[in-house]
Amino acid sequence: MDIAIQHPWFKRALGPFYPSRLFDQFFGEGLFEYDLLPFLSSTISPYYRQSLFRTVLDSGISEVRSDRDKFVIFLDVKHFSPEDLTVKVQEDFVEIHGKHNERQDDHGYISREFHRRYRLPSNVDQSALSCSLSADGMLTFSGPKIPSGVDAGHSERAIPVSREEKPSSAPSS
């Protein structure tokens, strides 16, 4: 008896019960048929594979990095300007909110809104937090870490979003 073995790389496109990009951070960009009916791809043929081109190149998912020296969040917000974004720190959390009112695009009228909340490590220096938006729409929130035993100064405050004219140096997914 022959059994078809699929490489794990294909599982995202082929898995009938694998979550689609429906709940990813695409901020109102269109959906594909397989986002609504993912089981169809596996019923056609076990070897049928949907295109991953857009998913790989334009995932829109945030990335959080925390190493020994710093804490960084990368978030794709290409449909928002700095005026549409609010970044604030409350206790041990950073909250990023984006909203733009209804405006016309190529397909009609659209409005977008998102809210993300991330827990800050306890040793991040909250007085030195910064946030910038690159020319290609990548929001970078970062803060240095301090040695243990030093007070990190937890308070509520807004972090201004500065605009950079160069593209982001964030890794592409």
From Swiss-Prot:
SUPFAM superfamilies: HSP20-like chaperones. Pfam families: Crystallin (PF00525), HSP20 (PF00011). Residues 153-167 have a biased composition (Basic and acidic residues). Its main location: cytoplasm. Gene3D superfamilies: 2.60.40.790. The gene is CRYAA. It is found in: Cytoplasm; Nucleus. The modification N6-acetyllysine is found at K70, K99. This is Alpha-crystallin A chain. It comes from Giraffa camelopardalis (Giraffe).
